[in-house]
């Protein structure tokens, strides 16, 4: 089951975009296979261009993307989140994001990380200074809210599709039944015609 098969993705994207603007947090949705199914909102250069732009940084990021649940600290020291999207007990994807600092950063710590990842230190620190700072409580509340809203939305969309399918099946069934009734009426009329002819023949024979 894929979200794009039953949900209005324009409305889905609107929810994510508005949430990202309101909170200052980054977010993206992925399908059950881990591939992006939405745009990337509020993604930082620190994460996308630099950390993920390095081979080792990308490897570490992808590991946390797969394994991270709830709100957690990523390998680069930022706070991220991963919330499952579930329809009728089946996981159909996740919404992941965050990319914010829980406090003012220790510059030397990030210079060390830049060296580990093979990233230019000065560019890394320059990008780091543009990363938003949020308390863990605010990040947790924001992430849970987005998860609840998106889960409510996709479940409503799924129910709507199922209901439309049921109505469509019922309509087809009613149409088929009406057609059958018309056929029966037609055959009944033909039988009556034959019976009338037989009566006339019988009377003539007598």
Say what each PLM segment does.
Residues 1-6, 129-131, 174:
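Short regulatory/linker helices and ligand/cofactor-binding micro-motifs at input modules
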Residues 1-77:
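Structured interaction and signal-relay segments at domain junctions
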Residues 59-115, 130, 134-141, 145, ...:
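Sensory/regulatory domains in signal-transduction proteins
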Residues 115-121:
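Active-site gating loops and adjacent loop-to-helix segments of metal-dependent hydrolytic enzymes
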Residues 122, 126, 133-171, 175:
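Signal-transmission coiled-coil "S-helix"-like helices
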Residues 168, 175, 179-182, 189:
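Residues at a fixed heptad register within alpha-helical coiled-coils and interdomain linker helices
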Residues 182-206:
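Amphipathic helical oligomerization segments
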């Amino acid at each position: 089951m894929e979200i794009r098969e039953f949900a209005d993705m324009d409305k889905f994207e609107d929810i994510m975009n508005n949430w990202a603007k309101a909170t200052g947090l980054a977010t993206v949705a992925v399908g059950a296979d881990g591939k992006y199914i939405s745009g990337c909102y509020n993604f930082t250069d620190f994460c996308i261009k630099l950390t993920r732009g390095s081979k080792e940084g990308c490897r570490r990021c992808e590991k946390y993307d797969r394994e991270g649940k709830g709100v957690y600290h990523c390998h680069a020291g930022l706070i991220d989140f991963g919330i499952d999207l579930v329809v009728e007990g089946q996981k159909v994807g996740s919404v992941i994001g965050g990319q914010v600092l829980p406090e003012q950063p220790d510059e030397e710590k990030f210079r060390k990380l830049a060296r580990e990842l093979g990233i230019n230190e000065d560019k890394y620190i320059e990008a780091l200074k543009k990363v938003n700072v949020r308390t863990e409580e605010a990040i947790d509340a924001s992430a849970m809210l987005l998860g609840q809203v998106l889960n409510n939305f996709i479940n409503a969309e799924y129910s709507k599709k199922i209901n439309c399918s049921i109505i469509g099946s019922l309509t087809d069934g009613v149409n088929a039944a009406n057609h059958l009734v018309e056929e029966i009426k037609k055959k009944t009329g033909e039988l009556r015609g034959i019976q009338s002819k037989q009566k006339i023949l019988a009377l003539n024979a007598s």
